[in-house]
């Protein structure tokens, strides 16, 4: 518990300390956010806000983890999930901002990178720390050895989670605030399961979100970019693997799931019927275009994330790992 608390404090403090330096540094490099014309009109005023602020997570979280629990097989895998996906996001942001290629990495390039990194993570979790291929079935309180089926399921979970967090990063403070509650839930789950290293990492991730939110709450002074959203998604997915909560993650991150489903349903509906279900997807834009102030949407989604994270913790309590 003590390591977990210190990891949270260190990550928060580091984030708060480097934020005032990072923002002007990104401005000097002219790493400003470009806003899509087809997005909500009110977002155009955000153009030029420094992006790639997710670098804060890539500094604060590893520092907190290494200071509190050091480098172990578990912390190594968790840091790989954070830093590896953060690197993919950084390359995507760099191409968008510096190379002026609006879409960043091509879809096949991003997917290939995510696929390779996911396979490395799965191998590290299953064999490197001997996690095995068993899955906990919530509600039934039984374990099922998925065998070879575990690998595609884990692959879907990692890639899906990283992109779900990326989709949710559309309003000031939204993705970081939602991830904060999920990370805090993982800290509680890991602590109850007597995994100090995993609990410390989850607490550091939550602390990093708090440090970042100080500069990202409305009106945001910097955005995390894909650097941050993919890093957060990769970290959350890896936490699910290590805590054996793969099948509970959709509950823990239910709002992220809703954001993703809104995009899938919107695209499918438009292709099949020519009509849209939502005013705009992801879901947060639907409410925004319905007249909700941005802060109201964000606070509502934060509250929903808190509730879903709490329910996820209750489902995970029988697990001991």
From Swiss-Prot:
Cofactor or coenzyme needed: Mg(2+)
UniProt EC number: 2.7.8.13
One example GO MF annotation: phospho-N-acetylmuramoyl-pentapeptide-transferase activity
Catalytic activities: UDP-N-acetyl-alpha-D-muramoyl-L-alanyl-gamma-D-glutamyl-meso-2,6-diaminopimeloyl-D-alanyl-D-alanine + di-trans,octa-cis-undecaprenyl phosphate = di-trans,octa-cis-undecaprenyl diphospho-N-acetyl-alpha-D-muramoyl-L-alanyl-D-glutamyl-meso-2,6-diaminopimeloyl-D-alanyl-D-alanine + UMP
GO cellular component: plasma membrane
Protein name (database record): Phospho-N-acetylmuramoyl-pentapeptide-transferase
Gene assigned in the entry: mraY
Keyword Cell division: yes
Highest taxon in the source lineage: Bacteria
Biological role stated in the UniProt entry: Catalyzes the initial step of the lipid cycle reactions in the biosynthesis of the cell wall peptidoglycan: transfers peptidoglycan precursor phospho-MurNAc-pentapeptide from UDP-MurNAc-pentapeptide onto the lipid carrier undecaprenyl phosphate, yielding undecaprenyl-pyrophosphoryl-MurNAc-pentapeptide, known as lipid I.
């Amino acid at each position: 518990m003590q390591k977990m608390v210190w990891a949270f404090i260190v990550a928060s403090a580091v984030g708060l300390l480097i934020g005032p330096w990072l923002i002007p540094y990104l401005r000097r490099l002219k790493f400003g956010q470009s806003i899509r014309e087809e997005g909500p009109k009110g977002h155009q005023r955000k153009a030029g806000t420094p992006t790639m602020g997710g670098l804060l997570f890539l500094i604060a979280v590893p520092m907190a983890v290494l200071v509190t629990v050091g480098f172990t097989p578990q912390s190594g895998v968790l840091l790989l999930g954070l830093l590896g996906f953060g690197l993919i996001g950084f390359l995507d942001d760099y191409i968008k901002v510096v190379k002026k290629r609006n879409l960043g990495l091509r879809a096949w390039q991003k997917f290939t990178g995510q696929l390779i990194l996911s396979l490395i993570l799965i191998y590290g979790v299953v064999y490197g720390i001997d996690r095995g291929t068993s899955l906990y079935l919530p509600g039934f309180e039984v374990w099922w050895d998925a065998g070879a089926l575990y690998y595609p399921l884990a692959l879907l979970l990692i890639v899906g989670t990283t992109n779900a967090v990326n989709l949710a990063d559309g309003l000031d403070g939204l993705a970081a605030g939602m991830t904060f509650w999920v990370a805090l839930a993982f800290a509680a789950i890991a602590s109850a399961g007597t995994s100090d290293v995993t609990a410390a990492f989850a607490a550091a991730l939550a602390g990093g979100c708090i440090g970042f939110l100080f500069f990202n709450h409305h009106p945001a002074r910097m955005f995390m970019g894909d650097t941050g959203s993919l890093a957060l998604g990769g970290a959350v997915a890896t936490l699910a693997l290590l805590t054996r909560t793969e099948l509970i993650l959709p509950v823990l991150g239910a709002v992220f799931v809703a954001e993703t489903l809104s995009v899938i349903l919107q695209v499918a509906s438009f292709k099949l019927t020519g009509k849209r279900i939502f005013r705009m997807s992801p879901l947060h834009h639907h409410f925004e275009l319905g007249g909700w102030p941005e802060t109201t949407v964000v606070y509502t989604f934060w509250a929903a994330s808190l509730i879903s994270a709490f329910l996820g913790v209750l489902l995970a309590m029988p697990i001991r790992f």
